[in-house]
Amino acid sequence: MTSNNYFAFKRFIVYHDKCGMKVGTDGVLLGAWANGGKRILDIGCGSGLITLMMAQRFPESEIIAIDIDKDAFQQTIENVARSEFAERISIFQTSIQRFATQYEAENNKKYDSIVCNPPFFVNSLKSPDSKRSAARHAKTLPFAELFAAVEKTMTDKGEFSVIIPTDYLGVFKAEASLHGLFLNRKYSLKTTAKKAAKRQLLSFSKQPPLKFDESEQTLLDNEGKKSEWYKGLTRDFYLDEK
């Protein structure tokens, strides 16, 4: 169930009327695909969608959600408070740059899983909606600074998972390599079988993978319905999936 102000999932509701990034396919895919751990960090949490998905999938986890935007921060607080997972989630209004240098320096805690649906319109003109523009524009979170923070805050055996446009795959992999991170999972996502892959689900680690996990998946079948892979991945979340 969805409306202009919220999106209802099986076990939680996400209101997104106050923040720039609305509930969308990218966030749902990442939240359903990323590996978890005892401690999880959601960078740029927006409405709290991915935070709540990870909390549902990994019931023993402790999750930290951060966002630099005041309205997104407040929206996540409200969405988390309405959920059954509130006791395991902490939310902070801060940038990942500041979080990595100040908060972690004081607490000396690192994360087993870091997730991020990053801003990626690196060279494009900003959209008229300033909040959405800030959420989607890489000026607020350069890839180099993102990877520097991940390198600092992730455990030696942790994973950093993201979803990005295929156009940025090369520069993203290069930046990861500069910060000592190895690509261990790569899922190329096509809307339909005849189209090129527009999105990439990526997972990075500090250790080279024993076996590289690479796959190409299609979101819609020939009739325009969700593919079996997409349905299987999101079955625990979408109301129309059994």
Predicted regions and their residues:
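SAM-dependent Rossmann-like transferase core, predominantly class I methyltransferases
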Residues: 2-39, 45-56, 203
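A generic structural signal for alpha->beta connector loops
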Residues: 11, 60, 86-88, 157, ...
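General small-molecule cofactor/ligand-binding pocket signal
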Residues: 15, 90-92, 184-187
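Conserved Class I SAM-dependent methyltransferase catalytic core
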Residues: 19, 141-197
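Residue-level signal for inorganic ion chemistry
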Residues: 30, 117, 146, 204
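Conserved SAM/SAH cofactor-binding pocket of Class I
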Residues: 32-127
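Mobile active-site "lid"/loop adjacent to the S-adenosyl-L-methionine
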Residues: 118-145
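SAM/dcSAM-binding transferase cores
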Residues: 194-242
